[in-house]
């Protein structure tokens, strides 16, 4: 089954201000009927990047069986981590980045990899606040 997950995260006073995430999951069943699920949550102290990660995690963790998943995000941080193979490099270096610095948000990256594991996931960057209905809805939820 193909599931499309649209995500967005936001934080005010970044870092350590209030924030939240939103995600919209869509799939079409065998009868051709569209199903939509919305997920969102807020936090008192967080960062924008943590909320971007949580949006993807929440979407993937909501799936109850292995799926083909297309993730649509305006976060280059999340999309490039997979499409430019940053995560592969971090894993090889023991969760270190260039100059041997620790990867930020490693707790959420590990959780995302675990949630992603049983699915065939592709990541797509979309321009934020550009009128794409699902992503605009995610921004509202966040």
Residue ranges with predicted function:
Residues 1-50, 54, 61-67, 82, ...:
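RNase H-like nuclease fold core
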Residues 10-16, 57-141:
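RNase H catalytic domain
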């Amino acid at each position: 089954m193909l599931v499309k997950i649209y995500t967005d995260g936001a934080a005010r006073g970044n870092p350590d201000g209030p924030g939240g995430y939103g995600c919209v999951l869509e799939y079409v069943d065998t009868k051709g009927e569209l199903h939509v699920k919305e997920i969102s949550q807020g936090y008192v102290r967080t960062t924008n990047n943590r909320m971007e990660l949580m949006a993807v995690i929440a979407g993937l963790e909501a799936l109850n069986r292995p799926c083909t998943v297309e993730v649509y995000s305006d976060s280059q941080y999340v999309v490039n981590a997979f499409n430019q193979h940053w995560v592969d490099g971090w894993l090889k270096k023991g969760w270190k980045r260039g100059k041997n610095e620790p990867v930020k948000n490693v707790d959420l990256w590990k959780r995302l990899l675990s949630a992603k594991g049983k699915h065939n996931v592709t990541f797509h960057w979309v321009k934020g606040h550009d009128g794409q209905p699902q992503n605009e809805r995610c921004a509202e939820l966040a």
